[in-house]
Regions:
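Long, contiguous interaction/recruitment modules in multidomain scaffold/adaptor proteins
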Residues: 1-53, 60, 67
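Canonical positions in the second alpha-helix
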Residues: 44, 78, 116-117, 150-151
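Helix-start (N-cap) detector for alpha-helical repeat units in TPR-like alpha-solenoids
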Residues: 52, 86-87, 91, 125-126, ...
Length: 185
């Protein structure tokens, strides 16, 4: 049995629609799950949450929903309650708090918490990348370049650090035009 071009077109269209439907449904389930978790945490209330891990999870959901001021409050409370947590958890919470501040263009505060994250876990390339990005936003190009170089020592294949350090290298080595006499006339 031979398929006409119209039948082939319909089959291909049907397969494409099924694939798109699967992706849309998966995204719907993911978003619904996040929304339900957010509602669950909001119903509990910030005051009833005392575990740093719960607070981190709540703050992460708030970041995904771009509720940065609320996430800052949540992460600050997590920091108050994380004395018994491992250094890795402390670093992740401090990095998330720094990210929340950076998202609101409060880069000096962000740098403070990125440095706390790095103090807890010195070989944490994500916090180092975020620190360098905040330094770059504050026009501290030499510091940002040095920080990206630290990232590259830890992770030579880090795409963000490679790209940003090349950009900063061009910016740092840039020499403005000095006039006609230097042109050779």
């Amino acid at each position: 049995m031979e398929l006409s071009s119209f039948q082939s077109y319909l089959i291909i269209l049907f397969v494409v629609l099924i694939i798109i439907s699967i992706f849309v449904f998966r995204q719907f389930l993911k978003t619904r799950s996040e929304e339900l978790n957010l509602v669950k945490f909001e119903q509990k209330g910030l005051d009833s949450l005392t575990q740093a891990t719960e607070l981190y999870e709540f703050g992460s959901i708030q970041i995904k929903k771009r509720l940065y001021p609320e996430a800052i409050k949540t992460f600050l409370k997590a920091i108050e309650n994380y004395e018994n947590e491992p250094d890795e958890a402390k670093a992740i919470i401090n990095n998330a708090l720094g990210f929340s501040y950076a998202a609101q263009n409060e880069f000096k505060k962000a740098i403070k918490y990125y440095k706390s994250a790095i103090k807890s876990l010195p070989e944490y390339p994500i916090a180092l990348n975020n620190l360098a990005s905040a330094q770059q936003r504050l026009l501290e190009y030499d510091l940002a370049y040095a920080t990206y170089q630290k990232v590259l020592m830890l992770d030579p294949k880090n795409k963000t650090a490679i790209k940003k350090s090349k950009e900063l290298e061009k910016r740092i080595n840039y020499k403005p035009y000095k006039g006609i006499k230097d042109k050779g006339f």
